[in-house]
């Protein structure tokens, strides 16, 4: 397929307040199944008593030794000789599996780092926590909270409560940017401010096109797109050169197939309303003569440093009519569109004589393997597309977050990634949804989405709101990261970013010669996150992704640190984990700032 790619002017990432209000009036790539009367849940403040320290004294464990020699901080990663058992925060007991009951808490790998709540699928018997803890296990009710998520929360003894009551979690429609400022340190929400930069089709294309200008075919990951009405003349010129060319017209912030048409008629191209027109892939790969696309799930816990996970399972969605394109049937949505929300109606409309099929992702890989097609190669290429999409959009999202978010740790996000394969098995990014539907109308949906909901909440690292003594626990997740860095941290970051530029991206293990408290917090958080990975796969950063650093709009210290950490850890993760554990024992993470709430 001819890509139709061409150079483009640079794109500004800056949004005025007026633009922001206009953009946030749209539903940014939401594809949740829900009614028209869905309402935004206003997030209440946490109760003061849950943010104050408990009066209980900290007991000294028998394995502590005041004469312990500190681990060497200078030098590259060195394995600790210490055999000391790590300790949990006081007043938090990590219970072991009790008979047929699964544990409620997941301990950290590191001393004084709080445990996280474990989540399970429906039907799992989970050890009941103490009444004092259970009273804090509350989740904000809203009409977009899917059933599989409710069941997962219920299994771990959460209660769904009204938005006006104390709650520690929220899953629903994206918030307005200003609402993030009211969030409290122990609340968790499933969106980032500024996620519209990847969830809106026009913004997503603008940012990918910007990277395309710098890196050429490396970023030919999305069908060429026109933003209407601005690019209307460019689009008309493209269509005039070949009568067989068509484009797919989409609203920039819709989902579930709403408002999509395949056309080449100028009357369908607006002169006022904002739409996007995407090159139609004329030769898609088909199975049993039907066009199909892939819904994958990507999870991002933070944009600084950027980390991207992809879920092991997903869905393959088929068109309900055999693919046989011609001028006469170009408007047949059941042939050309693969959205399940559209094709599930084909049987009722008399277009199909049986329900539209849907596969689990592993069925597609098995099918390819049986056909002699290298499914592993296709999966790697899909991962490449997804990582590049996030890299294209990370800078404007980070900039937006810096304006509206004081604690990045309170946010996480699950994205729905739609991919189509052409006849050469090349993956193309169609769009990114910031509220992928977890509605489970079939047994196949449940088999994919119920474990997904459980694994997302586990990766999010949700803590019991603390009542223990913060002076003796590394409750680093509750501390603002913006504007509180020490001079030591700022100097180190500036020097390594400068070295990265001077050495054209070359970095080595000297970056670990002195791990600052901020470095240590970031690495501890990352290692514990990997310990809760479930059926997700980390695709960025890995030991093999160093070459992606050049694609970022600007070098970011934490990205560089984490990338080098992954390279250093490739042989034996226990070496780095042991070093971090020794730093935790020395209370290194708390040494750079006052603890106040």
Curated annotation (Swiss-Prot):
Alphabetic keyword roster: ATP-binding, Ligase, Magnesium, Metal-binding, Nucleotide-binding
Organism: Caenorhabditis briggsae
Annotated disulfide bonds: none
SUPFAM superfamilies reported in the protein's UniProt record: Glutathione synthetase ATP-binding domain-like
Chain's role: Monoglutamylase which modifies tubulin, adding a single glutamate on the gamma-carboxyl group of specific glutamate residues of target proteins. Involved in the side-chain initiation step of the polyglutamylation reaction but not in the elongation step. Preferentially modifies beta-tail tubulin over the alpha-tubulin. Involved in side-chain glutamylation of tubulin in sensory cilia. Together with ttll-5 and ttll-11, required for male mating.
EC id: 6.3.2.-
Superkingdom of origin: Eukaryota
Residues the record marks as site: Essential for specifying initiation versus elongation step of the polyglutamylase activity: 256
Entry binding sites for Mg(2+) 2: 431, 433
Alphabetical list of PROSITE patterns matching this protein: TTL
Annotated residues for binding of Mg(2+) 1: 418, 431
Residues annotated as binding a protein: 256
GO cellular component: ciliary basal body
Needed co-factor(s): Mg(2+)
Family: Belongs to the tubulin--tyrosine ligase family.
Residues engaged in binding L-glutamate: 317, 340-341, 358, 449
Top-level class of the enzyme under EC nomenclature: ligase
Protein name per Swiss-Prot or TrEMBL: Tubulin polyglutamylase ttll-4
One BP term from GO: response to hermaphrodite contact
Residues that coordinate or bind ATP: 250, 256-257, 278-281, 291-293, 338-339
Stretches for region Disordered: 1-39, 80-107
GO molecular function terms attached to this record: ATP binding; metal ion binding; protein-glutamic acid ligase activity; protein-glutamic acid ligase activity, initiating; tubulin binding; tubulin-glutamic acid ligase activity
């Amino acid at each position: 397929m001819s890509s139709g790619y061409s150079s483009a002017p640079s794109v500004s990432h800056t949004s005025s307040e007026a633009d922001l209000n206009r953009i946030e009036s749209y539903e940014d790539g939401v594809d949740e199944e829900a009614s028209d009367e869905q309402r935004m849940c206003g997030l209440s403040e946490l109760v003061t008593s849950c943010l104050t320290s408990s009066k209980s004294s900290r007991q000294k464990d028998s394995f502590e030794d005041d004469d312990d020699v500190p681990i060497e901080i200078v030098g590259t990663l060195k394995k600790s000789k210490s055999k000391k058992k790590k300790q949990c925060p006081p007043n938090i007991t990590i219970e072991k599996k009790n008979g047929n009951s699964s544990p409620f808490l997941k301990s950290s790998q590191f001393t004084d780092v709080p445990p996280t709540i474990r989540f399970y699928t429906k039907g799992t018997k989970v050890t009941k926590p103490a009444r004092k803890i259970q009273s804090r296990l509350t989740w904000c009710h809203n009409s977009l909270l899917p059933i599989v998520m409710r069941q997962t929360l219920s299994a771990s003894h959460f209660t769904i409560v009204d938005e006006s009551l104390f709650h520690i979690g929220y899953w629903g429609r994206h918030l307005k940017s200003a609402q993030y400022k009211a969030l409290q340190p122990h609340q968790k929400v499933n969106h980032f401010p500024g996620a519209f930069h990847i969830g809106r089709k026009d913004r997503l294309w603008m940012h990918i096109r910007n990277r395309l200008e710098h890196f050429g075919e490396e970023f030919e990951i999305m069908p060429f797109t026109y933003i209407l009405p601005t690019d209307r003349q460019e689009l008309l010129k493209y269509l005039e050169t070949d009568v067989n060319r068509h484009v797919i017209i989409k609203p920039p912030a819709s989902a579930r197939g709403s408002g999509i048409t395949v056309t080449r008629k100028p009357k369908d191209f607006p002169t006022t309303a904002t739409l996007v027109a995407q090159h139609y892939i004329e030769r898609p790969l088909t199975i049993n003569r039907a066009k199909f696309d892939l819904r994958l799930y990507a999870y991002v816990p933070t944009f600084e440093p950027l980390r991207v996970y992809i879920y092991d399972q997903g869905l393959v969605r088929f068109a309900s009519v055999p693919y046989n394109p011609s001028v006469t049937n170009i408007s047949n949505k059941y042939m050309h569109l693969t959205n399940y929300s559209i094709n599930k109606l084909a049987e009722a409309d008399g277009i199909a004589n049986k329900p539209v099929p849907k596969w689990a992702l592993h069925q597609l890989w098995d099918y390819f393997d049986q056909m002699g097609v290298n499914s592993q190669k296709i999966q790697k290429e899909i991962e490449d597309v997804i990582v590049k999409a996030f890299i294209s959009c990370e800078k404007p999202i980070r900039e937006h977050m810096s304006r509206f978010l004081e604690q990045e740790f309170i946010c996480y996000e699950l994205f729905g990634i739609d991919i189509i394969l052409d006849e050469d098995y090349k993956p193309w990014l169609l769009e990114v949804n910031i509220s992928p539907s977890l509605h489970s109308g079939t047994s196949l949906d449940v088999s994919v989405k119920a474990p997904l909901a459980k694994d997302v909440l586990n990766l999010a690292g949700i803590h019991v709101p603390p009542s223990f003594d913060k002076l003796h626990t590394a409750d680093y997740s509750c501390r603002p990261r913006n504007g509180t860095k020490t001079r030591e941290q700022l100097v180190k970051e500036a020097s390594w970013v400068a070295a990265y530029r001077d050495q054209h991206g070359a970095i080595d293990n000297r970056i670990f010669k002195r791990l600052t408290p901020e470095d240590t917090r970031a690495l501890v958080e990352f290692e514990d996150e990997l310990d809760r990975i479930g059926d997700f796969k980390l695709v960025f950063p890995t030991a093999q992704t160093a070459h992606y650093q050049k694609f970022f709009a600007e070098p970011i210290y934490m990205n560089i640190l984490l990338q080098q950490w992954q390279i250093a850890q490739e042989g034996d993760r226990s070496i780095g984990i042991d070093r971090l554990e020794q730093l935790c024992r020395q209370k290194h993470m708390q040494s750079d700032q006052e603890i106040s709430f």
